């Protein structure tokens, strides 16, 4: 680690603590040359996989698109923002845990439905009707029947 004061490369760690719910490490360092102290924060760089669309095109994972889809599904439903954020975090964690560089958009849609079915059944049906492109009322009935099992 370079000293921000004198650019020396010889620094030592004086103190280390976990911060941000254990997702970061705060370190107090001291420069061996000028003896100035400074703080650094370290965190894991978690890279989301790229999304392979149904047409074969690839694009970066877009958390806002995921959030927007969930917000549309739960609109005017008794689901809190905390519940939504927890569901989104679970989806992102599952995607990272695959260890893959690319995931199919279908997998993301299925993960979204898995979370919605636990949050709110109506929101699940709303999302499924768009995601699965329901053509008529019987498809809604089939989806509702599966929920009631």
Swiss-Prot record:
InterPro entries: ATP-cone_dom (IPR005144), NrdR-like_N (IPR055173), RNR_NrdR-like (IPR003796)
Keywords annotated in UniProt: ATP-binding, DNA-binding, Metal-binding, Nucleotide-binding, Repressor, Transcription, Transcription regulation, Zinc, Zinc-finger
Domain ATP-cone per the UniProt entry, residue ranges: 49-139
A Pfam match: ATP-cone
unnamed zinc finger span: 3-34
A GO BP entry: negative regulation of DNA-templated transcription
Record GO terms (molecular function): ATP binding; DNA binding; zinc ion binding
Cofactor(s) essential for the protein: Zn(2+)
Note describing how the cofactor binds: Binds 1 zinc ion.
Entry superkingdom: Bacteria
Function comment: Negatively regulates transcription of bacterial ribonucleotide reductase nrd genes and operons by binding to NrdR-boxes.
Family of the protein in this entry: Belongs to the NrdR family.
NCBIfam families: transcriptional regulator NrdR
Protein name: Transcriptional repressor NrdR
Native species: Shewanella sediminis (strain HAW-EB3)
Gene name in the database record: nrdR
